[in-house]
Regions:
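Conserved post-Walker A coupling segment in P-loop NTPases
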Residues: 14-82, 86-94, 98-99, 162-169
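Conserved Walker
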Residues: 76-87, 92, 98-105, 111-128, ...
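Short alpha-helix of the ABC ATPase nucleotide-binding domain corresponding to the H-loop/switch region
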Residues: 68, 106-107
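Surface-exposed alpha-helical interface segments used for non-catalytic interactions
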Residues: 40, 107-111, 149, 153
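Nucleotide-binding/hydrolysis machinery
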Residues: 4-14, 20-24, 30, 34, ...
């Protein structure tokens, strides 16, 4: 799906309906601010809306410990005001600029996503919907060998491309 040449505010719930009906990972490629607005809207419309929406900026130097905290409830510390009980809830994790992760963390994230239970109320320890964004096309980074192919395919279950003409909310 390509979202282009119109305000993100004009994007209807119908545009997100396929992703709302699924618990699969979603990857937004394009404008980062727009991607986060769409991720928040998707969270609000989904079965995960009763849990927290936790954003992790993968381009920041402290991305690794923050990402590991959100994906490992057992060892979780405070992340962006999310206390341990809040992290234990089923919710949505938004990985902003996931393409900026280093190779080691890409591999670890891929392994963690392989064990992730992606249903609200799931019995496994970690219950999260993962939505990610990248301002660069990750498929070309996979072709270049600079992005982990397994992680790309785990994140790219539902892919939405945001044109440079779209404007954030």
């Amino acid at each position: 799906m390509t979202i282009q040449e119109r305000d993100v505010a004009a994007i209807t719930d119908v545009d997100l309906s396929h992703a709302v009906q699924s618990d699969a990972c979603v990857l937004f490629t394009g404008d980062d601010g727009t991607a986060e607005a769409l991720a928040r809207r998707l969270h609000a419309l989904s079965g995960w809306r009763h849990g927290p929406f936790i954003a992790v900026d993968c381009s920041l130097p402290d991305a690794e410990p923050r990402l590991l905290q959100v994906l490992d409830v057992e060892n979780a510390a405070i992340v962006e005001g999310a206390t341990r009980p809040r992290l234990a809830q089923a919710g949505t994790v938004f990985l902003r600029e996931v393409g900026k992760l280093g190779p080691g963390l890409q591999r670890r994230l891929s392994e963690r996503l392989a064990t992730l239970k992606t249903r609200p109320g799931a019995e496994r320890r970690l219950r999260r919907r993962v939505i990610s964004s990248s301002s660069v096309p990750l498929d070309s980074r996979v072709q270049e060998g600079t992005f982990d192919a397994r992680l790309f395919y785990r994140l790219n279950v539902i892919h939405m491309v945001i044109s440079g003409h779209a404007r954030g909310w």
